[in-house]
Swiss-Prot record:
<dbReference type="GO" id="GO:0008081">
    <property type="term" value="F:phosphoric diester hydrolase activity"/>
</dbReference>
<dbReference type="InterPro" id="IPR017946">
    <property type="entry name" value="PLC-like_Pdiesterase_TIM-brl"/>
</dbReference>
<keyword id="KW-0325">Glycoprotein</keyword>
<feature type="glycosylation site" description="N-linked (GlcNAc...) asparagine">
    <location>
        <position position="91"/>
    </location>
</feature>
<keyword id="KW-0732">Signal</keyword>
<comment type="similarity">
    <text>Belongs to the AIM6 family.</text>
</comment>
<dbReference type="GO" id="GO:0006629">
    <property type="term" value="P:lipid metabolic process"/>
</dbReference>
<protein>
    <recommendedName>
        <fullName>Altered inheritance of mitochondria protein 6 homolog ARB_06966</fullName>
    </recommendedName>
</protein>
<keyword id="KW-0964">Secreted</keyword>
<dbReference type="GO" id="GO:0005576">
    <property type="term" value="C:extracellular region"/>
</dbReference>
<feature type="glycosylation site" description="N-linked (GlcNAc...) asparagine">
    <location>
        <position position="184"/>
    </location>
</feature>
<feature type="signal peptide">
    <location>
        <begin position="1"/>
        <end position="21"/>
    </location>
</feature>
<dbReference type="InterPro" id="IPR051236">
    <property type="entry name" value="HAT_RTT109-like"/>
</dbReference>
């Protein structure tokens, strides 16, 4: 796949030397039609990217947040269907970063996530005389019905910050791109599903009968939770299973396996997906074995810091 992409790019780039294997007339045709509207696919912004059930953990650490989770710097598809941003509220602005010392005035929820999301969604939902109204396709051209989970981890003063987050979603809301709940009973899927986590106040989520945001369910105890509140629930893997032996052929012993199976079963009975965070990233063999085990046991999302490795896993 990689070689074919590179070969096509070499043929079509006018700045490159002619390819000897092709006749000169064909080379000229390929070069001269490169920018013609006839040969431009209208929703090609994510063309060829296959979505994978991976959560881009601490996505804002990446060289290019949001975009890297979709396509990596090397143009090798990543296709993560879930991304996460930590936010701090200061002076009515939502800044993105893991801790306060890492914040900058340029890195905001708006600049790193809302605006890029709108940019991609506008490209995957172009105006067309061939459709009767606006479309609600997701960010992945190969699977337009796949939602993108946007987790917003509130790091300070959740009660005060959450209304600002709801307000920040307005561009996505106006374009009808958000998954929503109507009258506390009707689930309407959309291109983007927002899930509040960290310091997100549960009371401000469940109090709205009509809303376009959800809550990260507490996987340890889902009493009182439904998929209308929490489409996905999460918890720390380490807190559930304790120490994991990296030198063992099987990363989880029978007792540990039973613990996660019990949680996954309880969540599935409520139609709630499961994600485990704080999963070891090293040694590589252990990480991969844990991914394999968790996926086999039925989690909805695999937590990944190395999205390239996760893509290779699938």
């Amino acid at each position: 796949m990689k070689s074919s992409i590179l070969a096509s790019a070499a043929i079509l780039a006018a700045s490159l030397e002619p390819v000897a294997a092709l006749s000169e007339p064909l080379q000229n045709i390929l070069i001269n039609t490169d920018r013609s509207p006839i040969y431009r696919y209208p929703t090609d912004v994510t063309r060829g990217i296959v979505p994978i059930p991976v959560h881009s953990h601490n996505d804002y650490w990446r060289d290019i947040p949001f975009y890297t989770a979709l396509t990596t710097k090397l143009a090798l598809s990543a296709g993560c269907i879930s991304i996460e941003a930590d936010v701090f509220l200061f002076n009515d602005t939502l800044y993105v970063g893991h801790e306060e010392s890492a914040l900058t005035k340029e890195r905001t929820l708006q600049s790193l996530y809302i605006e890029p999301l709108m940019n991609v969604l506008k490209k995957t939902n172009p105006k067309s005389p061939f459709v009767s109204g606006p479309t609600r396709h997701g960010v992945f051209d190969t699977s337009s019905g796949q939602t993108l989970y946007l987790w917003i981890d509130v790091k300070n003063d959740g009660e005060k910050a959450w209304p600002h987050i709801v307000k920040a979603l307005q561009p996505l809301r106006d374009a009808n791109y958000l998954t929503k709940i109507q009258n506390n009973e009707s689930f309407v899927p959309g291109p983007v599903t927002v899930i509040g986590t960290g310091g997100t106040p549960l009371s401000q989520v469940v109090s709205a009968a009509d809303r376009d945001y959800f809550y990260d369910g507490p996987l340890k105890d889902l009493t009182g939770f439904t998929s209308l509140i929490s489409p996905i629930a999460s918890t720390s893997l380490m807190e559930v299973v304790g120490d994991i032996k990296s030198d063992s052929e099987n990363p989880l012993n029978p007792t540990q396996l039973e613990a996660i199976r019990k949680q996954i079963k309880a969540a599935k009975e409520k139609s709630i997906g499961v994600r485990y965070w704080e999963t070891p990233g090293w040694p590589i063999r252990l990480r991969n074995e844990l991914w394999r085990t968790l996926w086999k046991e039925g989690v909805a999302l695999l937590n990944a810091d190395d999205v390239n490795a996760a893509k290779g896993y699938f």
